[in-house]
């Protein structure tokens, strides 16, 4: 497998073409951003840790029957994935009130919900990634009704799997963001990453944060936090 030209560079990753059709080469960066890019920093080691954690979690989800784009980890900061066309929606699952939800609906941060809430956000930096209803999504033709239903069902299934996994590590899965894409056959797959960049994780007992809120709120050293999370997950080096 050969890495070829750069296709896209985002806030946290670079995406390269390869010499194999429908396979992409992902490189995780040592960059942290928050508040839609208003806060930025270089965090040495962050790319390696997010690559390790995402590779582990996507492998475990694959074993649990969740179709996703991950193929294998190929270096400390790189992985191979199946090429997909990203559906321009962020699917957010919330188990505990935190972050923007607390501000938006006025409930105290830390309030445990009786059942998970699934939200859809438009992936559009110019608009500030607004929250959308299903009617908005239909109006903008971002996804079909069946695709939305599938993504919601998969998000809740992934939530069940990850909640159980993190609970075994004495962590609460507060909320998390997913992205999905369509492969060359039109099949919808879980894509992007699942890492402490995209999840809120709290220690069950102390409520210590094990996620990017440490950077957002200047609560400590991000590399140390992500390292502790990987250690709790077992520090496994996983491939599909």
From Swiss-Prot:
Catalytic class of the enzyme: ligase
EC number: 6.3.2.6
Keyword ATP-binding attached: yes
Top-rank taxon: Bacteria
Matching InterPro entries: SAICAR_synt/ADE2_N (IPR028923), SAICAR_synt_PurC (IPR033934), SAICAR_synth (IPR001636), SAICAR_synthetase (IPR050089), SAICAR_synthetase_CS (IPR018236)
Catalytic activity: 5-amino-1-(5-phospho-D-ribosyl)imidazole-4-carboxylate + L-aspartate + ATP = (2S)-2-[5-amino-1-(5-phospho-beta-D-ribosyl)imidazole-4-carboxamido]succinate + ADP + phosphate + 2 H(+)
Pathway assignment: Purine metabolism; IMP biosynthesis via de novo pathway; 5-amino-1-(5-phospho-D-ribosyl)imidazole-4-carboxamide from 5-amino-1-(5-phospho-D-ribosyl)imidazole-4-carboxylate: step 1/2
Alphabetic keyword roster: ATP-binding, Ligase, Nucleotide-binding, Purine biosynthesis
Biological-process GO terms, alphabetical: 'de novo' IMP biosynthetic process; cobalamin biosynthetic process
A GO molecular-function descriptor: ATP binding
UniProt xrefs under HAMAP family: SAICAR_synth
Similarity-based family: Belongs to the SAICAR synthetase family.
Name under which the protein is recorded: Phosphoribosylaminoimidazole-succinocarboxamide synthase
Organism (species): Anoxybacillus flavithermus (strain DSM 21510 / WK1)
Gene: purC
């Amino acid at each position: 497998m050969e890495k070829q030209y750069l296709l896209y560079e985002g806030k946290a990753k670079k995406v390269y073409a390869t010499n194999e059709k429908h396979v992409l080469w992902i490189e995780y960066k040592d960059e942290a951003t928050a508040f839609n890019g208003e806060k930025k920093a270089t965090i040495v080691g962050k790319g390696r840790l997010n690559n390790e954690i995402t590779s582990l979690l996507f492998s475990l989800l694959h074993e649990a029957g969740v179709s996703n784009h991950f193929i294998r980890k190929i270096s400390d900061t790189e992985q191979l994935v199946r090429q997909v066309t990203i559906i321009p929606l962020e699917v957010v699952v919330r188990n505990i009130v935190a972050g923007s939800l607390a501000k938006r609906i006025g409930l105290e941060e830390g309030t445990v919900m009786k059942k998970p809430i699934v939200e859809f956000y438009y992936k559009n930096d110019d608009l500030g990634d607004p929250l959308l209803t299903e009617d908005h999504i239909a109006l903008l033709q971002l996804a079909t009704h069946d695709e939305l239903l599938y993504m919601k069902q998969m998000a809740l299934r992934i939530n069940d799997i990850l909640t159980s996994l993190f609970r075994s590590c004495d962590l609460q899965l507060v909320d998390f963001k997913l992205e999905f894409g369509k492969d060359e056959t039109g099949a919808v797959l879980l894509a992007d990453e699942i890492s402490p960049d995209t999840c809120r994780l709290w220690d069950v007992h102390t409520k210590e944060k094990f996620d990017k809120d440490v950077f957002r709120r200047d609560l400590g050293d991000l590399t140390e936090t992500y390292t502790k999370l990987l250690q709790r997950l077992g520090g496994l080096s996983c491939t599909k």
